[in-house]
Amino acid sequence: AVFVDLEPTVVDEVRTGTYRQLFHPEQLITGKEDAANNYARGHYTIGKEIVDLVLDRLSVDYGKKNLDIERPTYTNLNRLIGQIVSSITASLRFDGALNVDLTEFQTNLVPYPRIHFPLATYAPVISAEKAYHEQLSVAEITNACFEPANQMVKTIQFVDWCPTGFKVGINYQPPTVVPGGDLAKLDHKFDLMYAK
């Protein structure tokens, strides 16, 4: 988790609270003063001061490594996060074997009720250029889901005494890619085969 607030009081409660050891201090980002409920002040002046810190903490190198984007922007980051959230919540909108409504969503997503911090992994994240000449099997995509490089939380460290588990849900609706976006569709060769 990354905690960001222009006003430090709320995040300082996490820094000094009971659960402070759960969060890395570098993931608690605060400014020196708040925007005083003024959008323009937060967007154009005070907020711009911590943008670099936030982008560094959100592992912007993810876009550099996987999508061949030299300098990822907010748009690139928002598209990636939007794609992940859309895919995770697809079973709320379409037919699927699990996560039929919001109450079942948490029940099925959290393997142990006391350990309720879900970790999202998304694979494959490849650019449109790579998709034309890379052939990925189901086994490779499945293995990529368990690689730490594809996890959306970079600072998590599991302890030995904590039980770990995962759940898989099947959704019959494939994810939709933003037209002109950074991520590639994987059905290009299928489309070529049936274009004749």
From Swiss-Prot:
Q: Which cofactor does it need?
A: Mg(2+)
Which keywords, in A-to-Z order, does the entry hold?
Cytoplasm, Cytoskeleton, GTP-binding, Hydrolase, Magnesium, Metal-binding, Microtubule, Nitration, Nucleotide-binding
Keyword set includes Repeat:
no
Taxonomic superkingdom: Eukaryota
- State its Enzyme Commission number(s): 3.6.5.-
Catalysed reactions, as listed in the record = GTP + H2O = GDP + phosphate + H(+)
**GO MF annotation list:** GTP binding; hydrolase activity; metal ion binding
- The answer to whether keyword Nucleotide-binding applies is yes
Leading EC class? hydrolase
Modification after translation (UniProt):
Some glutamate residues at the C-terminus are polyglycylated, resulting in polyglycine chains on the gamma-carboxyl group. Glycylation is mainly limited to tubulin incorporated into axonemes (cilia and flagella) whereas glutamylation is prevalent in neuronal cells, centrioles, axonemes, and the mitotic spindle. Both modifications can coexist on the same protein on adjacent residues, and lowering polyglycylation levels increases polyglutamylation, and reciprocally. Cilia and flagella glycylation is required for their stability and maintenance. Flagella glycylation controls sperm motility.
- GO cellular component assignments: cytoplasm; microtubule
Example GO BP = microtubule-based process
3'-nitrotyrosine sites (modified residues) = Y19
- Where located? Cytoplasm, Cytoskeleton
**Residues bound to GTP:** E7, N78
Active-site residue list: E104
Question: Which positions bind Mg(2+)?
Answer: E7
Q: Please state which protein family the record places this protein in.
A: Belongs to the tubulin family.
Q: What does this protein do?
A: Tubulin is the major constituent of microtubules, a cylinder consisting of laterally associated linear protofilaments composed of alpha- and beta-tubulin heterodimers. Microtubules grow by the addition of GTP-tubulin dimers to the microtubule end, where a stabilizing cap forms. Below the cap, tubulin dimers are in GDP-bound state, owing to GTPase activity of alpha-tubulin.
Q: How does it assemble?
A: Dimer of alpha and beta chains. A typical microtubule is a hollow water-filled tube with an outer diameter of 25 nm and an inner diameter of 15 nM. Alpha-beta heterodimers associate head-to-tail to form protofilaments running lengthwise along the microtubule wall with the beta-tubulin subunit facing the microtubule plus end conferring a structural polarity. Microtubules usually have 13 protofilaments but different protofilament numbers can be found in some organisms and specialized cells.
Give the protein name, as stated in the record: Tubulin alpha-3 chain
Its ancestry begins with: Eukaryota, Metazoa, Chordata, Craniata, Vertebrata
